[in-house]
């Protein structure tokens, strides 16, 4: 819920939906309510792999979600998001990237150790993300400039 609360703080007229695993969704619901944001965000508990994502959004975000999963599961998540977005809807992906501009070796080493410790997932290059996004039904894929390229790369894609 941290990304949602930050986005809502920046854009006063914005309304949001949050989808996360049920225990995380409950924590987010309580946190957002304590920040006075309950009236601007609808929280849904579920799993990308078992439940349909709620529809009705123009933009979906995946923030540090895909790098925890292998390609098969990452593609399943992207397909679920594509199914929930209307034609012309936008996906914003903020993830560690294997080819961080200006920090290739350092970023690859950092996330290599992180993912080794986690025992799963991987950082992907922009080309690898683009291939997964296309396979899930997205096009107009762009890499945006990030203020912290070592930690996060940002990609937009249109359904």
Model region roles, listed by residue range:
Residues 2-159:
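Alpha-helical subdomain
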